Amino acid sequence: GPGVSLMQEFIGLAYFAEIPAVLFDVQRGSPSTGMPTKTQQADLLSAAYASHGDTKHPLLFPEDPTECFEMGALAFDLADRLQTPVFVMLELDTGMQDWLTAPFRWDDARALDRGKVMGAEELEAGRDFGRYLDVDGDGIPYRTLPGTHPRRGAFFTRGTSKDRYARYTEEGPAYVDNMQRLLRKFETAKSL
């Protein structure tokens, strides 16, 4: 609901800095405080294009608590794989009512999809690491996780324009390159 409106700037930061995030949006009648006890699909455009500028976000639409559970797990995989915010869009009835369901089953052997993560071995071998470098042409760069390597793979991320190596720049070609890469990422998301 209105909480998505209040989070727009931070959603844009997560999108542009490519920080995985999952947001569950229980929609109600809007605008403003609207009708807080009535269901409505009022946040679709707000979530799809959350923040200013050229942002797009994957949206998942569960219809019952079981799908909420399943799509919740999928949302975390997609957020990591695409390195972007993912929304799980619920209607008020689904999110706020009491439901009788079969027990949810979690498979402890299920592998998490962390996406493109560069390990210490690759860094040690001298593989070129640029936090926003699109090696595979799908718009999704490789990332490292904190503590991967004592001297390589660290990066400083920001919400401002940057080049492929996460260095601040306002040069037009670097900005255009980054925005085109982000659009390729969204095209990749359509095929997942």
Residue ranges, per PLM feature:
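Thiamine diphosphate
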Residues: 1-49, 58-79
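A broad, low-specificity signal for short, low-complexity segments enriched in glycine/proline
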Residues: 17-23, 46-51, 156, 164-173
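Short acidic, glycine-rich surface-loop motifs adjacent to enzyme active sites
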Residues: 55
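Flexible, low-complexity linker and terminal segments
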Residues: 71-192
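Ligand-binding clefts of soluble mixed alpha/beta catalytic domains
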Residues: 30-32, 45-52, 115-117, 121-123, ...
